[in-house]
């Protein structure tokens, strides 16, 4: 029997997986379904440099990019690790060939959505 904590863990991992699959497949509807409208996705503009610049994408920006089709030429696939989970928030690490990404998710009603993402090239 699966309890509510296990269901939540499975749901969080599924959201992270769907996010990456939608990127690899160029599926904007699937992408939008797992992103909070106020999502912020960031990366350091010049990793390791002393400059404090960040590049930032929004949910709408990511959906627009994915609308143009598949976003990678590498073999799709990802390793999703649930790092921590509380009642209504969770942290996930996703490793794929193009990216290493840390996701923060929050529960909204009966749905889990990605609200923050921090990434670097894999």
Features from the language model and the residues they span:
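Short, low-complexity N-terminal intrinsically disordered segments enriched in polar/charged residues
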Residues: 1-29, 33, 37-38, 54-56
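Surface-exposed, charged secondary-structure patches
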Residues: 4-11, 40-100
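Preference for short coil/turn "hinge" residues that link or interrupt alpha-helices
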Residues: 27, 32, 76-78, 105
């Amino acid at each position: 029997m699966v309890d509510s904590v296990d269901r939540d863990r499975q749901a969080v991992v599924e959201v992270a997986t769907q996010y990456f699959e939608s990127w690899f497949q160029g599926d904007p509807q699937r992408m939008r379904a797992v992103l909070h409208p106020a999502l912020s996705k960031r990366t350091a503009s010049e990793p390791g440099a002393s400059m404090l610049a960040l590049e930032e994408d929004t949910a709408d920006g990511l959906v627009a990019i994915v609308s143009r089709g598949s976003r990678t030429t590498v073999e799709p696939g990802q390793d999703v690790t649930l790092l921590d989970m509380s009642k209504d928030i969770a942290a996930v690490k996703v490793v794929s060939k193009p990216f290493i990404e840390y996701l923060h998710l929050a529960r909204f009603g009966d749905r889990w959505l990605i609200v923050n993402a921090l990434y670097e090239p894999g």
